[in-house]
Amino acid sequence: MGQLPKPSKISFGTDGLRGRVDTMLTPALALQVGYWCGRVLQAEGPVLIGMDSRSSGSMLVAALTAGLTASGREVWTLGLCPTPAVPGLIRRYSAAGGLMVSASHNPPEDNGIKVFGATGSKLSPERQQAIEAGLCGGDGSGMALAASGAARHRPELLDDYRASLLSSVGQHRLDGVPIVLDLCWGSATACGAEVFSALGADLTVLHGDPDGTRINVNCGSTHLEALRRAVIEKGAAMGFGFDGDADRMLAVDGQGRVVDGDHVLFLWGSVLQEQGQLPDQRLVATVMSNLGFERAWQARGGLLDRTPVGDQHVHAEMVRTGAALGGEQSGHILSSAHGLAGDGVLTALQIASLCHAQQLSLAEWVDQSFQAYPQKLVNVRVENRERRKGWADCAPLSSLVQEAEASMAEDGRVLVRASGTEPLLRVMVEAADQAVVDHWTSSLAAAAELHLNAS
């Protein structure tokens, strides 16, 4: 039997593997990842593979398929689809697991691989480490090829995913509601316009075709300017912008104001609370969520659990506590009633249908929610991974963080963390006063730039 060559050291970040296709995420590496995923996944059944619209996607899917079939696995490729379609279809068809080829909100030249187990959840750290060990371990002697598995292209399975989106809103309709969708040239183009149109919405679509060279470029949830303009120009009730793989969404109300994940959690959570469908009145959010949100939710008698950044941490806490709803300020929203997978299109459908059912505009609903504290996030590029990850060991920077925290006391927060997907140190400051926020973000970002990038 043949053997596969051993790649250099790699590791999973906060959302799988991610990087530039021409340097880090090569076809050779994807073949290896496919092989070791096939070996590490424990359940029987096919392995599903979806992809976003990036130009490198088909190449990487082919390499992953080769690796998986080399491990003896049967593979079903889905083609273009949102990330949440993969875990949903894993559960529906009792698959062994699945992979999504996407770099989410990253630029077009990047790509990534997300891995899901038989329950539809992202792999545990232990399973990820087993794949890493296989990729990088020993002399490759354990990597003998198995008898080849089969591969089939199954795009028709996405009809089940679209049907699940429509059923998620029950009998609610959106007849005549003017809505703008920014599909980001990405995965949301596979279903976003179709499901909103099926519910009767008066739809305007931006960036509505799959385009791997323009995915995330000045559009979608990370660049809301075009969506905000379109909502105002069209006199729309609301707009929704998705990221490249459609697992997250940010909204815009009829006044052009951004409605982030904190507001989505508060609004959807309030409805569940009033319906008696929110155990312990609990929501799960991350350390990035706004203090104004937390205090307003507590004023409603609710509990807010915070986790580290990353929807996998939100997922784990929801499972641990039995929470019904959780998510991130950036727009990943997880609902236990809908499979605990972040799904931007599903979340947009929920918000639109709940607004319509209550006969409220999104702007009116947001005005009834909470006043966010001023919050500012600055990204400092730090190429040195060790310095970036170990920023707290930099005495001048950590001392300045402590000074900022002491000066704001209970009226503000500082959060400094290394990105899990990009060479960035993220500096966030939140306070009751905008001038205080501006002062400390500027000071902390300058200190990080000076001390972490020093030669």
Curated annotation (Swiss-Prot):
InterPro entries: A-D-PHexomutase_a/b/a-I (IPR005844), A-D-PHexomutase_a/b/a-I/II/III (IPR016055), A-D-PHexomutase_a/b/a-II (IPR005845), A-D-PHexomutase_a/b/a-III (IPR005846), A-D-PHexomutase_C (IPR005843), A-D-PHexomutase_C_sf (IPR036900), A-D-PHexomutase_CS (IPR016066), Alpha-D-phosphohexomutase_SF (IPR005841). Its cofactor is Mg(2+). Activated by phosphorylation. GO terms for biological process: carbohydrate metabolic process; peptidoglycan biosynthetic process; UDP-N-acetylglucosamine biosynthetic process. Keywords: Isomerase, Magnesium, Metal-binding, Phosphoprotein. Its EC number is 5.4.2.10. GO terms for cellular component: cytosol. It holds the Pfam family PGM_PMM_IV. Catalyzes the conversion of glucosamine-6-phosphate to glucosamine-1-phosphate. This is Phosphoglucosamine mutase. Binds 1 Mg(2+) ion per subunit. Mg(2+) binds at residues 104, 243, 245, 247. Belongs to the phosphohexose mutase family. It is an enzyme of class 5 (isomerase). Coiled coil: none annotated. The keyword Metal-binding applies. The modification Phosphoserine is found at residue 104. NCBIfam families: glmM. It catalyses: alpha-D-glucosamine 1-phosphate = D-glucosamine 6-phosphate. GO terms for molecular function: magnesium ion binding; phosphoglucosamine mutase activity; phosphomannomutase activity. The active site is at residue 104.
